[in-house]
């Protein structure tokens, strides 16, 4: 039976790339079932053995390889010897595995996803050559697409822009008639600035430290302002120390280990969402905040300007500029009507452009187009 193969870095943990992987796998599994194909999904960094994942009403299976690169590579090569039709790789770093699979099966078509920061610099000979050999490279934003051309020398005809969409579970919560209750430890009677991310040293580009540095100035005009940071990571002690050094520790809350319904409630009960990153390839968290009718503040870099329309659905600020960030926060916290209008515009934009159904349609068309080239 003809098979669609999926290669993933990781799917089970929280995180934007992980969630994107789940979305791609769900769409690919549905695409295969509707056409009488089989599918085989492999994940390099997830725990060993078989796993079942649900995305909305759909379920799919995949095998984890616990960071064992030789076993993962051998499994991919074995899959390439069993009537493979199409291989989809969720990260440019997996492109060399795709290239090896295509050496074994000359008719195998390929799609590789790029995200953002990882393609801002040349990938090196092996990964770069493998990426350039893909039939199609999918980018979530104009910025990522431009870096694929300028830094990776991918021909524009082999690049397709496809924005991510909201998670079906998140969409279902938006349709619920009963508003979510305030999460435990979420501040009450305060103007809440929310940010969501993974707080590891490698993720400092997301700008959590700039948010903390901007808070003292915000408090001068909005004394009941509070910053809520949702997420885990090894950089949390450094951020907590920065909060103490800045004299704002009493105005900062770290929340971690939240369930999806608790994260949704954080969006629903905040006043402003902010992630002043310099390197977002897209930023799924912006979609989630905007879907909950919250104004979003992001970095004026990377793929963020594709999502946030400056002055309409939110505000864009230069990465690392605490003064401009504090001004943006003050302007929205001190003017609830403006914030409400931006939030409403953001929700309209998400409903118009960023649903899971739209992502599913776009990826299905991309797979069809690549397979047509085979004939």
Features from the language model and the residues they span:
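Carbohydrate-associated surface elements
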Residues: 143, 165
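Short hydrophobic beta-strand element within catalytic cores of glycosyltransferases
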Residues: 295-298, 308
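Conserved donor-binding/catalytic core segment of Leloir-type glycosyltransferases
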Residues: 185-206, 212-215
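Aromatic "clamp/platform" in nucleotide-sugar-dependent glycosyltransferases that forms part
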Residues: 278
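A short, well-ordered alpha-helix in the C-terminal region of glycosyltransferases
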Residues: 324, 331, 338-353, 359-362
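Conserved acidic donor-binding segment of nucleotide-sugar-dependent glycosyltransferases
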Residues: 310-311, 315-322, 331-337
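Nucleotide-activated donor-binding/catalytic signature segment of Leloir-type glycosyltransferases, i.e.
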Residues: 237-258
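Short alpha-helical donor nucleotide-sugar binding micro-motif in glycosyltransferases
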Residues: 131, 257-258, 265-270
